Amino acid sequence: MLGDNIFGFDATDSAKSLNAAFAPAIAARIPWAAVLGNHDQEGTLSRGGVMKHIVRLKHTLSQFNPSEAHIIDGFGNYNLEVGGVEGSDFANKSVLNLYFLDSGDYSTVPAIPGYGWIKPSQQLWFQRTSAKLRVRISLDSNCTIF
């Protein structure tokens, strides 16, 4: 799920709305991942509260934030490595890296109106994480950023 998982202004109970949004994947027992959108906090939960709820749901691969990043802006910044097919030469190897970054909600800079953006702490985490992965797997695997 790629952000704006609920419509905050109509969500009188954000947790209930999130449960409904992810119910099809949960019922089908499909592993899934989510990242926050700029409106997810407009209901009854804060941005952190929304992500805390998401990471407790069944079959989610979502993470609150990377454990090694003690100071990082936003909630739900993480990466997932997709491994190759069992029985292939790529089994147990990272063939695709998915990066999930919280771009925030609204600008906190008065001179810049509109929506938020990826912050330097997140850029640094991305650079460090992708560099470690490149060294570990000793080649450039593909990556996608959400």
Residues covered by each model-derived region:
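Active-site beta-strand/loop signature of hydrolases that rely on acidic residues for catalysis
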Residues: 1-6, 37, 141-146
